[in-house]
């Protein structure tokens, strides 16, 4: 996953006003499903460029979402190019307990 930078690169015009991809930080929100209401997790520096507190890997977020749906992320697989793959990768994704009510 990726977020968007808070700044625009290049000259701003009517046709060029987008922001670049930002691979270090991204924002998402979830509602219901046993997640904490009004909870903010993680923090970036003053320039919203680097993570300074509680980083989360997308695989950990996926593991948490799957758990809240009653699905064991380590057992859920799909076939791709002849191999069983997991949405949470093979590197030991973990549920983020701070997000769960």
Each language-model region and where it sits:
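Ligand-binding pockets and gating/stacking loops
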Residues: 2-101
């Amino acid at each position: 996953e990726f977020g968007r930078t808070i700044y625009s690169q290049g000259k701003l015009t009517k046709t060029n006003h987008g922001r670049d991809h930002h691979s270090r930080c991204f924002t998402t929100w979830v509602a219901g499903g046993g997640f904490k209401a009004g909870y903010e997790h993680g923090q970036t520096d003053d320039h919203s460029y680097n993570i300074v507190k509680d980083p989360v890997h997308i695989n950990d977020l996926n593991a948490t979402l799957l758990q809240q749906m009653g699905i064991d992320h380590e057992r859920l697989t799909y076939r791709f190019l002849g191999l069983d793959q997991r949405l949470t990768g093979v590197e030991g994704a973990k549920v983020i307990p701070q997000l769960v009510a």
